[in-house]
A protein has these predicted regions:
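Soluble C-terminal extramembrane regulatory/interaction domains of multi-pass membrane proteins
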Residues: 3-142
Length: 142
């Protein structure tokens, strides 16, 4: 459930909080991803879960700050946070129920520090330390 959730989160953020964003692409992608999630919930006979909130106001401010630091223009109004909350309410209840049903966790909006992404590690890292070193050099140049 991580991939569709990240897609929905990203589209929702683009649609509600970013300036000069590709809105048409975000709308289409959001609609397709939400449709897939809702259909999957229906196929698995999984009722939506209420009371889900994966993003607090403090975390939203942190997300905004990270985007701004990366040079992405974001809307600073409280209206954008409200719109994001409303849009999240259209899919979080489904992804939360599905995650519970198939016993996986949902991704946080803000990743924990010092945790490697799945693509950055493998079961063979101990045998090939140069791979990890190369990835670090390329992905985190100093």
């Amino acid at each position: 459930m991580e991939a569709p959730t990240v897609i929905l989160d990203t589209c929702a953020l683009v649609l509600t909080s970013m300036e000069d964003a590709p809105l048409a692409a975000a709308r289409f992608t959001f609609a397709a991803a939400r449709h897939a999630v809702v259909d999957l919930a229906q196929v698995l006979n999984t009722s939506p879960t209420t009371g889900v909130n994966r993003l607090s106001s403090a975390e939203f401010a942190q997300v905004r700050g990270r985007l701004a630091a990366a040079g992405i223009r974001v809307q600073e109004s409280t209206a954008s946070e409200q719109k994001l909350e409303e849009l999240r309410a259209t899919y979080e209840l489904f992804v939360s129920a599905l995650a519970e049903r198939i016993q996986v966790s949902l991704p946080p909006w803000i990743p924990p520090a010092d945790v490697l992404d799945d693509w950055q590690t493998s079961a063979w890292d101990d045998q090939f330390p140069s791979i990890h070193q190369t990835l670090n050099k390329v992905m985190h140049p100093q």
